[in-house]
């Protein structure tokens, strides 16, 4: 058994040698579309499976068969001693686990420090567990989906239902002695993009508007703290408080996960003890032909969907 990372990297170019596998020079799409998609005209990073023509137009992995470019380097072999272990224990090595590990590593939470997580989907859930594993003393998680809040609380997260409070920032400051969290992770993902409709949804507290969530993250971090962004931003964000970041000396780290960089850290934890609870993340399992249903219930947050696993 092998696990295929979501980004495609060669393993030998300049950026791969720097362990920045999501920036692989060999697989980067240098076409006009990728260049046009960059506000700075610098194009995009490494090709990604199933991520449109902007990232290489490589077909995605939700299929019966998958062609794997750069297969000499990318696929991660499941250890032979893990024979008989369920696929789900290793499945998340393709994206969820390394993305979460990188988010926590970039957050640079002090020993026994406090981490805030905005968005308790799969990345937020796993980030909380990894943060505790790596020595965080306290994790505060923000969302409004009951099933997400319940699952996070099971793993020791102090949860905040943003639909039930007037001002998340003020509550987080109150919970942290007025200073704010040592670090925050924006794991909201591509749920909103700051449009008028999204703003209305945020105003009515139906969902967490992405730009608003980012500002709440920043406003809830202590001076000298760190913001780690794992939620994907496809373009400019309105009202980005750069001046406040400068004044508060908040460091910002972000980017697509460099999957292979973190595999050696994660693999020893995928044992029968399952300290990260990888087998507890899946809420739905369905055949491949039901993928549209899986996407729908996840996008609409129906039927308690947190993570849907498709089986061919």
Language-model region placement:
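Glycine-rich Rossmann-fold phosphate-binding loop(s) that bind the pyrophosphate
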Residues: 96, 119-123, 232
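NAD(P)H dinucleotide-binding glycine-rich loop of Rossmann-like/cofactor-binding domains
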Residues: 10-118
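Glycine-rich helix-loop-beta junction characteristic of Rossmann-like nucleotide cofactor-binding loops
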Residues: 105-110, 176-177, 219
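Glycine-rich phosphate-binding loop and adjacent beta-alpha segment
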Residues: 136, 188-274, 312
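Generic structural signal for buried aliphatic residues
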Residues: 1-3, 115, 227
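C-terminal hydrophobic helical "lid"/dimerization subdomain
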Residues: 165, 179, 260-312
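Adenosine-nucleotide cofactor-binding segment
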Residues: 117-120, 125, 132-216
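Conserved "cap/hinge" positions at secondary-structure junctions
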Residues: 3-6, 231
């Amino acid at each position: 058994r092998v696990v295929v990372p979501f980004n495609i990297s060669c393993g030998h170019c300049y950026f791969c040698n720097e362990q920045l596998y999501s920036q692989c020079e060999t697989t980067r799409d240098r076409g006009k579309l990728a260049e046009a998609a960059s506000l700075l005209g610098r194009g995009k990073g490494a090709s990604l499976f199933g991520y449109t023509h902007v990232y290489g137009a490589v077909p995605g992995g939700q299929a019966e068969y998958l062609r794997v470019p750069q297969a000499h380097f990318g696929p991660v072999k499941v250890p032979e001693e893990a024979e008989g272990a369920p696929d789900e224990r290793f499945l998340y090595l393709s994206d969820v686990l390394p993305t979460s590990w990188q988010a926590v590593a970039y957050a640079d939470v002090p020993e026994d420090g406090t981490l805030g997580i905005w968005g308790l989907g799969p990345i937020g859930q796993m980030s909380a567990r990894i943060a505790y594993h790596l020595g965080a003393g306290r994790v505060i998680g923000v969302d409004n989906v009951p099933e997400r809040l319940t699952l996070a609380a099971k793993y020791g997260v102090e949860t905040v239902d943003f639909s039930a409070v007037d001002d998340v920032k003020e509550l987080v400051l109150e919970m942290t002695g007025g200073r704010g969290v040592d670090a925050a992770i924006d794991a909201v993902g591509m749920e909103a993009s700051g449009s008028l409709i999204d703003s209305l949804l945020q105003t009515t507290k139906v969902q967490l508007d992405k730009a608003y969530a980012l500002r709440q993250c920043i406003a809830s971090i202590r001076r000298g703290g760190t913001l780690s962004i794992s939620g994907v931003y496809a373009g400019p964000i309105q009202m980005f408080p750069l001046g406040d970041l400068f004044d508060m000396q908040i460091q910002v780290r972000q980017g697509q996960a460099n999957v292979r960089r973190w595999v050696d850290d994660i693999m020893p934890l995928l044992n029968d003890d399952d300290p990260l609870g990888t087998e507890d993340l899946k809420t739905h399992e369905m055949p491949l032909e039901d993928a549209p249903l899986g996407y729908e219930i996840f996008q609409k947050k129906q039927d308690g969907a947190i993570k849907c696993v498709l089986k061919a």
